[in-house]
Every structure is written in C-alpha cells, then in structure tokens.
Amino acid sequence: MAFDFKKECKELYRPASKPSIITVPPMSYVAVRGKGDPNTEGGEYQNALPLLYGIAYTVKMSKKGSRSIEGYFDFVVPPLEGFWWQESPSGDIDYVRKDDFNFISCIRLPDFVTRDDFDWAVAEATAKKKLDFSAVELLKVDEGLCVQCMHTGPYDNEPATVGAMNEYTTEQGYVPDFSDTRFHHEIYLSDPRKCAPEKLKTVVRHPIKRAE
C-alpha cells in the first residue's frame, strides 16, 4: 500500500469544521512562486500546476527508473497547497483583490527527498515532459504554531471560516502572527474541476503566537 499523508496525518489534512490549534512539523515541498489572480487562464498560478505535479510524480515513479533514492517508499502524491498574501500590514486577505495575490503554490514531498534527488527530478522531468522547470524550488517550511479549520464551500466564502478562526484564536489567548515567512495557508482536498463549489473542502491555516 502506498503511504497516504492525508490518512496517516489526519491532524494536518482532516481538521474539524471548528477551529483548533496545532503545531505543524517541518516539511519539504516542491514549490513555485508567483503573483496574480489564480483563476486567470495562462496566468502564473495556472502555469505552476503542471510543474509541481511533474516533479511530484517524477519522484513517485523513480522506483521504476534508473534512480535509486535512499529511503524511498511508495506514496500517494499529497494534495496541492498554497501560501497566499497581499501587501497588507495586518496580513488579512482581501478576496476581491485577486490580482494583488502573491503565492507560493506547492506539493509536499516525502522527507527522503534530498537536494540531489530533487535536482535529479528536475532534470528528469525537463527531459521527459519538455517543459521549463526552472521556476521550481525545493522549499523547507516550519510552520510551527497555527490555528486551522476545515472550510467547506466556495473559496470566496472563506472569510466566514477565517472569522471563526480569528475569534477562536482570541478566546484561546493567541494572536495572528503573519510575517514575511508566515502566511495564509490553504490545502486543497477537492478538485474544483470535478466538485461542486458548495462541496469543496479546503484546510485553512493561519500562523499564531501567544498574546503578550
């Protein structure tokens, strides 16, 4: 059986529909940075997706190729994720100003993937898929203390979920802790091409710290 991060790490990928506090461990990602409305056809976000999946599946399928990755185990490619921010002192997201989005779009990689393995995957994917993978990077993220919640419904309805998260954060004696390294985080458990908007499931996660 292939290792499924969603099933084995339910605290990270299957939170309740009510907010909760969690300490997220360090993780590795294949990532692409960009700007702009994620819904724009041919935009930076849309162009990032085949690059991310190209690397993730190259690593997964390495078992059938010439590269032997130390510590390799078969795995289900984890869900697409995104770190989002706008130029705002508060760190709040304005869902109307989609053109002002900055993003890091990413897919989690197993811990066995080293820099050499990643560089091999980039070269292998470039040769086989005939795409320009120069924008991808191996990203290490240590999110640490966060509040998170399962959001069900359209992405544009997330402010209600974020409001509940903010209220819970305050009640528990914490405050938001957005910075140039800590962002609004979304994990996409549903494929919007195949799922009705009202049934979309998205993990929403925000960095927090103890109130002083």
Where are these regions (language model features)?
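A solvent-exposed interaction/effector surface
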Residues: M1-E212
